[in-house]
């Protein structure tokens, strides 16, 4: 089963990716690597799954050096065309949506960032799941979102 994990470089997302790979799933991780949280921590989590920082830029799928069943793409959820292409090309059976712009205080001064990521981005995930007949969608959030 091929599974998309959004927020794959985040704390929870990186653990979800590892557990799915350990149980034998094929996984595509997606994250925009924004700088709200420490970027080097995110790249460190990706490195634990075999994704090399220098290869993880741009909008191309990068193959893991540790797991043959893992690929990663740096992408914004709000890029509807890129999301549509990813879903069409990869034909995911399941999606675990963990990506979001976090932080309550930051949302007061930068509401547009939250609308684009947490509303528009999630809408794109939902539409891509619907149009590509994804069997299951798991949506999770934290108190920080």
Explain the meaning of each model-derived region:
Residues 1-145:
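N-terminal Rossmann-like NAD(P)+-binding domain of SDR-like oxidoreductases, especially those catalyzing
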């Amino acid at each position: 089963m091929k599974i998309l994990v959004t927020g794959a470089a985040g704390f929870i997302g990186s653990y979800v990716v590892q557990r799915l790979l350990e149980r034998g799933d094929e996984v595509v991780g997606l994250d925009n690597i924004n700088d709200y949280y420490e970027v080097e921590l995110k790249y460190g989590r990706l490195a634990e799954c075999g994704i090399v920082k220098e290869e993880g830029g741009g909008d191309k799928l990068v193959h893991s050096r540790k797991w043959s069943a893992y690929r990663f793409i740096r992408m914004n959820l709000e890029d509807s065309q890129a999301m549509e292409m990813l879903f069409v090309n990869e034909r995911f059976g399941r999606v675990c949506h963990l990506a979001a712009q976090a932080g309550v205080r930051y949302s007061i001064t930068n509401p547009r960032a939250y609308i684009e990521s947490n509303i528009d981005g999630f809408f794109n995930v939902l539409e891509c799941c619907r149009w590509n007949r994804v069997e299951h969608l798991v949506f999770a959030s934290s108190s920080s979102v």
